[in-house]
């Protein structure tokens, strides 16, 4: 398993805390800038990254800081894709926004883990097929594993 530098993690937490203190808490989500939204939702990214780090999905191929970094890339991309009309029309804006962002963050972390796992790079569409239909499609799984083992011969 890859280890992370504790000093860097402590510095990251301190910087995040200082940036969070500087935010104006009286604004609605729509009134914040992109950078401010990133700062607000960085704890969500860290939460999701920690779940990946402790589960089998990351399986020791990336450190927690790498997972947080991939999650932040997904957070920035998700913030740029927010449709504020949909968020404003919902009953619970915070819940809607967090569920939208968490889906994008999880996808970015999953993609980062897939790219850094192992020596054989598998195309993303094949990984998605395997992930979705692992129980239902035995032929896909057999083809996937047979192609790996035949390439080792």
State each model region's role.
Residues 1-122:
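Alpha-helical promoter-recognition and RNA polymerase-docking modules of transcription initiation factors
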Residues 114, 121-153:
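Charged, low-cysteine interdomain linkers and short loop/connector segments
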């Amino acid at each position: 398993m890859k280890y992370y530098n504790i000093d860097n993690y402590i510095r990251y937490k301190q910087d995040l805390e200082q940036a969070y203190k500087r935010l104006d808490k009286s604004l609605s989500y729509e009134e914040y800038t992109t950078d401010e939204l990133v700062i607000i939702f960085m704890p969500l990214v860290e939460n999701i990254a920690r779940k990946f780090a402790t589960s089998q999905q990351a399986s020791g191929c990336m450190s927690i800081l790498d997972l947080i970094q991939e999650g932040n890339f997904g957070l920035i991309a998700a913030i740029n894709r927010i449709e504020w009309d949909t968020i404003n029309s919902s009953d619970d804006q915070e819940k809607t926004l967090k569920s939208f962002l968490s889906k994008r963050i999880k996808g970015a972390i999953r993609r980062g883990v897939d790219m850094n796992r192992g020596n054989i790079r598998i195309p993303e569409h094949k990984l998605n097929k395997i992930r979705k239909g692992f129980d239902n499609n035995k032929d896909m799984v057999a083809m996937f594993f047979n192609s790996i083992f035949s390439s080792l011969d």
